[in-house]
Amino acid sequence: VERYSKNALTQGRNLLTLEICKKMIRQFLQYDARRAAQGTLILKGVETKLDFEMQHPTLKLPMKFTGVVDRLEVYDNAFIIWDYKSGAIGQSDLSLSGLGDLWKGSKGKPLQILLYAWLLWKKELVTHPFPWHSGMFKLQSGQPEHLLRGAALGKSNDITEALLFDFEQALCDYLSEVPSN
């Protein structure tokens, strides 16, 4: 901040960006305050760094997976993995008919959440029992609680240990098929 003029945040595009950021933060804090007033909210982690190393079961190559989860919480005794999004989230973005959809390039949001859940599970960082839940918070509009859904998650739309076993198998299968050049 010291390198920029004092007017940098009081006019033009920077002022507009600052005001939009303030609005997003205000909406998020209001949402959080409402949830805390309505139920039991226990924050378990913010910007939690995850990493896991393993050897590919058939290729016998080392693999390292990393990620940063925006927020982990327990709300009314349900463990929730949150991801904050500054852009648009459509219902179809979060619908997953099968784990094979993850590798087609159009299901980045479900892939991200399932990878985070898998990393938490593999590292045994969560003591809360399954099922777990996922959430995405649209910062631009203040619209929360977009959950992963679809046949891949079953009727409950929950993240289960069985789903994470299947995810790991699908991930390893996909990585076996990726060309090495």
Describe these PLM feature segments.
Residues N7-A8, Y75, Q91, H146:
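Hydrophobic, well-ordered secondary-structure segments
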Residues N14, L18-K22, G39, P62-F65, ...:
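Active-site-proximal structural scaffolding
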Residues G45-K123:
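Non-catalytic protein-protein interaction segments used by genome-maintenance enzymes to assemble
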Residues R34-T40, V74-A78, K122-P129:
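Secondary-structure transition/capping motifs at alpha-helix termini
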Residues V1-Q55, L148-L163, L175:
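A non-catalytic, helix-rich entry segment at domain boundaries
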Residues Y4, S106-G108, L115-N181:
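Metal-dependent nuclease catalytic regions and adjoining charged, substrate-binding loops involved
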